[in-house]
């Protein structure tokens, strides 16, 4: 048995605010663990045949969240993988319950100033369009942190390079699952 085999038994679901690195870290984590990677946002876009920004503009956030819930449900019915969820996905009680049942959840957490700097460079996020990223993040943190705290594992990422964060996640998962990484 290789040292990462215990980490491949269940899906690893990454949760956290926008800009924390769920997709970037998720891809690298999946590669390190030899697991498939799934990005819930990309899967929603593929299922809808349009971008998230278009879904928000045409149908609104509730329609997007419903599609997101359905996509995550489908993904969690499949074999183990690393799943990058959308920032609001874990806020849905049904999605959260399913993640708790079928996956190990990891909250990637970073300082809001770091996240604001990261997302300020990217104008495709519909929740920050035309708004101050830090103000949006502060409001989201207030609403979401108590729910994110229900995650199985919490990893404080700081402003570390993605490969460092991957190592932190592997170490935290290994500790949580009670399997020594050799």
Model-derived segments and spans:
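Hydrophobic anchor at the beta1->P-loop junction of P-loop NTPases
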Residues: 14
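Walker A (P-loop) phosphate-binding loop of P-loop NTPases
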Residues: 19
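Hydrophobic positions on the alpha1 helix immediately C-terminal to the Walker A/P-loop
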Residues: 25
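Short glycine-rich anion-binding loops that position phosphate/pyrophosphate groups of nucleotides
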Residues: 87-89, 111-113, 160-161
